[in-house]
Design a protein with these regions (language model features):
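Donor/substrate-binding cores of folate-linked one-carbon enzymes
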Residues: 22, 28, 36, 86-208
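A residue-level signal for conserved active-site and pocket-lining positions in enzyme catalytic cores
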Residues: 11, 33, 46, 83, ...
Length: 213
């Protein structure tokens, strides 16, 4: 029996595509793709893969609690076991997070707890760190503050301050982040679906991850 996931997006949907392509023969089914924007390129990717889509936009429903309530109902109707935030660029309400406690994961382009929030790649470059990376974590009610599942680091070459960098330099570094994201997120979902990920009952900050070989 397949492990049922839904993917929430806002923009290009490259991490959604990585899930579509990277889950392979894993017993995981993407049962729905929800977007916060009607013009998300990710919706086209989902439809091309034959996936069900829906839009939950604050432009249509400005009350965030009502919007998130409708989204939660939509997920429950599809018996979703895991909600994957793959470039979903909005904070979810505490009520939504409590409703799916321990069943929401997010991918973030930084080694948390450093550089949480928006513009994580820009923050990384502006600070001048020598090692960057990507984090997959459970979602709690804070800003990118939930328990960490997986992280992957990589070295950054010397670069000038972001204001002085050329577009090509920035694009090359952003592509490195994307490469890691597109590998790490499907791996995390596979591990969760296989029951290899668990939060320590005695210390909720600690996540046990069994090797995937």
């Amino acid at each position: 029996m397949s492990f049922r996931i839904a993917v929430l997006i806002s923009g290009e949907g490259s991490n959604l595509q990585a899930l579509i392509d990277g889950l392979g023969d894993a017993p995981v089914e993407i049962v729905g793709v929800g977007s916060s924007r009607a013009d998300s390129r990710g919706l086209e990717r989902a439809e091309a893969a034959g996936l069900e889509t829906a839009v939950f936009s604050l432009a249509d429903e400005p009350d965030r609690d009502k919007r998130d309530g409708a989204l939660a109902d939509w997920l429950d109707q599809r018996d979703v076991e895991l909600v994957v935030l793959a470039g979903f660029m909005e904070l979810l309400t505490p009520g939504f997070i409590r409703r799916f406690a321990g069943r929401i994961v997010n991918i973030h382009p930084a080694l948390l707890p450093s550089f949480a929030g928006l513009r994580a790649v820009a923050q990384t470059l502006e600070y001048g760190v020598k090692v960057a990376g990507v984090t997959v974590h459970f979602v709690d009610e804070g800003m990118d503050s939930g328990p960490i599942i997986l992280q992957e680091a990589f070295g950054l070459p010397y670069h000038r301050g972001i204001e002085a960098m050329g577009e090509g330099e920035i694009d090359a570094i952003e592509e490195r982040f994307h490469e890691v994201e597109h590998r790490l997120l499907p791996r995390a979902v596979r591990l969760i679906a296989a029951g290899r990920v668990s939060i320590d009952p005695d210390d909720s900050r600690q996540v046990r991850v069994e090797s995937d070989g």
